Amino acid sequence: MPQLLGGRLKDVLIVVLVILLIASWGYFFTRPKPPTYKRLTDPEVLVIAMDTSDAVSLDPARAYELTSCLVVNQLYDKLVDFAPPDYTEIVPEVAESWEVLPDGVTWVFHIRKGIKFADGTPLNATAVAFSIKRVIKLKQAASWVLTQFGLTEDSIKVIDEYTVQIKLGYKVAPRIFLSCLSFTVGAIVNPKEVLAHQKNGDLGSEWLTDHSAGSGPFILEKWERESEIVLVANEKYWKGTPRIKKVIIKHVPEPTDQLLLLEKGDIDIAWSLTSDQIEEVREKPGIKIASRPAFQKAYLGMNVGFKPFSDERVRDAIRWAIDYDAIIKMLKGGAKKLQTFIEEGILGYNPATPYYRDVNKAKALLAEAGYPNGFEVELMAPPSYPARDVAAIIKSSLEEIGIKVNIRLVTAAEMYEKYRKQGHQLILAEWGADYPDPDALAKPFADYRVKQLAWRNMWYDDYAANLTEQAAVEFDLSKRLALYKELTEYVLDKGPYAILYQVVNQIALRTWVENFEPDPTFFLLDLSRVYKESVYEVVP
């Protein structure tokens, strides 16, 4: 009996084992397959879509357009820079320290040791002196940023291997000169490479149009015009190799095309979407908006040479007539209220906004000035967004007080050519600071002697011009701020402008892009700080 039981038990165990084996085979062949993942983006490559058609040259001595300046800042270092995210504090870069001698015009810069250009050549005082002299000698459009201080080639001297002396032509508030050195013309180029590619005494300018010779975080790999600009990481960068190994700036002029590429994930950053498009994608999964007030403003210029505008009361009437709120609402986050010529974020910003839409007050001022029935005027504006829409609101506002406005939409090139010859009546334009200091705004808006905006609008006001000069040479910061407060209020009340709004930069990007912050200018953005997260999706 026990033997029989043992045999049956053995048979049962064999059957169970067979069943388990069959079940395991079945599971093996029918079990769910492990998911397959697809990487959505390369974390080492940053792709930006923007209109690059403005770029003329990537030579720091010639770069003066948005695209050119943005790229140059990735390729080169300067003596000083502005610290993000506020861009209000001037910090050392190539120069580790500096001092102004007692004469108030002689500056001594001590160069940081250990910095090398991308080809391994040491960056020293000779390179710094060569770069600044090169800007002065080439006399390109942006050179005025440095030559305005009376600099000549003889003004720059090498004291020793890591010390440079720069002697200005006159005393100036230290912050102004340092701010100007942060602009692209302050970039330090490699004399060895530049002179090796010199043609007919051009100091390598033709070669530098589409090559780089810097010590910055990136190196220019190629520039295919109307196609793309490609940068690769500088493995020898003295601050450390960027996490992004390649930056591709694609030429995509149409915002609609930028939007489609962003939504598909083919690009990381869409540089210039319209306000409507920004609103459209604001809540879309995988996309975020980076925004900050820019050092740029839109304004209405009134030519004092046009008889009605020679009367301050007429200019004031226009300021009271404009529907500022309607303009800002139309721009959907792309603008904020500003009525003085120094933008928020720049030293000397005056938050005063006394003007609002008051039709009755505007009509009364017109009548008092002798224009109870208004007059007819031409408003020049570019045909692009948002200028044409802002012009329409201004037209509607002014016609409500009896001023008939004929809008003339012309290309920016034609408009500015006429503007520079004082050939307008009303003009809708934008202006940004060439360097982040109030002097960069006070001179054009208040000093007609520099032949910029005040001169173009035929506003020859000696009080405003003298106040501008006084502020520029004031070393005491508190006194300088007081001068700019007085000047901004004076121009607000007496000047030939209606400041409409401060531009707010809004840039759409994929959520996998980290540490990207729009800078308030077009030349301080540092892409070496940006990185990308790896993002995957399950393949069906």
Q: For the regions a protein language model found, what residue spans apply to each?
A:
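Ligand-site clamp/hinge motif
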Residues: 206, 234-280, 404-406
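Structural transition elements
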Residues: 218, 303, 336-368, 384-389
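N-terminal lobe/hinge region of extracytoplasmic solute-binding protein
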Residues: 49-102, 133, 211-215
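Aromatic- and charge-enriched surface segment that lines or borders ligand/interaction sites
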Residues: 96-141, 165, 258-261, 308-310
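Detector for C-terminal structural segments
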Residues: 67-70, 224, 321-349, 385-395, ...
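Gly/Pro-rich hinge or "lid" segments in bacterial periplasmic/extracellular proteins
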Residues: 83-85, 182-242, 246, 359-360, ...
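A bilobed periplasmic-binding-protein/Venus flytrap-type ligand-binding module shared by bacterial periplasmic
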Residues: 83, 232-235, 292-317, 321, ...
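Surface-exposed binding/hinge segments that line
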Residues: 110, 144-197
